[in-house]
C-alpha cells in the first residue's frame, strides 16, 4: 500500500526555485532517511507534506490516494505529525506535556486512553520516574522522546522528523535512534496500519542504521532514491 506519493513537486520562494520536479513514492511502514547538504530543500519537502510551507508552485502530494490540499489542515497535521529539531516544552510536568496531544482530537474511547498512554511511554522509552518532573528541566534527549510520545499518543500514522538528533550529543543521539529503531514498522494506534517515517539527518550513518530507503536531495533535485 502506498502511504505517500509525491508527483512533480515544485517549490519556489521570492522567485528562487527551492524544489524542482520532486517525484517519489513511499510504502506504508517504510522508514525514509532524507540526506543532503544544508539548503538542499530537505526541510521544505517535509513542510510541504503537512502544509507548513505555502510556497508550492506545481505538482501534488497524495496521502493514501488523496491530495493533501483536500484535507482539513488540522486533520492532516494530526495524521502527518511534524517533529522539529528541538521539541517544544510547555510549563508543567512531563506527563502534562505528553498528554497535551489528547486535546487535539483522537479516536480513542476514554477507557482506551490510559492503556494507550502506558504503551506510548514504553515505546518512547520514557521512564515513570520523570513523569512528575517539570518538562523544561529534562535533558535534550528526554525532551525529544516527549515530542515523539505526543505524536504517538495522537495515533499519528506518519511521522515527519526534521533532524531530531541535531542538537544532541553522540551518546544521547545513539539512544534516541535506538528508540526510533524500536518504533520502526510498529502499528499506528489509530488505524492498525504500520507507522511510516520520514527523517531528515545530516548523519549518513544514522540514515543507514534506521532507514529502508535513502532519499538524497541536492540543490532542490532528487539525485538518488535507493534501498539501504
Predicted regions and their residues:
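Conserved ABC ATPase "signature" region
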Residues: 111-130, 178-181
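Hydrophobic anchor residue at the start of the ABC signature
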Residues: 148
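Conserved ABC transporter NBD signature motif
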Residues: 58-67, 76
Amino acid at each position: 500500500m502506498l502511504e505517500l506519493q509525491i508527483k512533480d513537486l515544485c517549490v519556489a520562494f521570492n522567485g528562487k526555485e527551492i524544489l524542482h520536479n520532486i517525484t517519489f513514492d513511499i510504502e506504508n511502514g517504510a522508514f525514509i532517511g532524507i540526506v543532503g547538504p544544508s539548503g538542499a530543500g530537505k526541510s521544505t519537502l517535509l513542510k510541504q507534506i503537512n502544509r507548513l510551507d505555502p510556497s508550492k508552485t506545481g505538482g501534488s502530494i497524495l496521502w493514501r490516494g488523496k491530495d493533501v490540499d483536500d484535507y482539513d489542515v488540522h486533520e492532516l497535521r494530526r495524521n502527518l505529525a511534524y517533529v522539529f529539531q528541538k521539541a517544544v516544552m510547555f510549563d508543567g510536568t512531563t506527563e502534562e506535556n505528553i498528554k497535551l496531544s489528547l486535546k487535539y482530537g483522537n479516536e480513542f474511547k476514554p477507557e482506551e486512553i490510559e492503556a494507550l498512554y502506558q504503551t506510548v511511554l514504553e515505546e518512547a522509552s520514557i521512564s515513570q520516574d520523570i513523569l512528575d518532573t517539570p518538562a523544561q528541566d529534562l535533558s535534550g534527549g528526554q525532551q525529544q522522546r516527549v515530542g515523539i510520545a505526543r505524536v504517538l499518543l495522537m495515533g499519528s500514522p506518519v511521522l515527519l522528523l526534521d533532524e531530531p538528533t541535531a542538537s544532541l550529543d553522540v551518546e544521547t543521539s545513539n539512544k534516541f535512534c535506538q528508540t526510533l529503531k524500536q518504533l520502526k514498522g510498529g502499528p499506528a494506534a489509530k488505524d492498525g496500519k504500520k507507522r511510516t517515517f520520514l527523517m531528515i539527518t545530516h548523519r549518513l550513518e544514522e540514515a543507514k542504521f534506521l532507514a529502508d530507503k535513502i532519499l538524497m536531495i541536492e540543490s532542490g533535485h532528487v539525485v538518488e532514491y535507493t534501498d539501504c
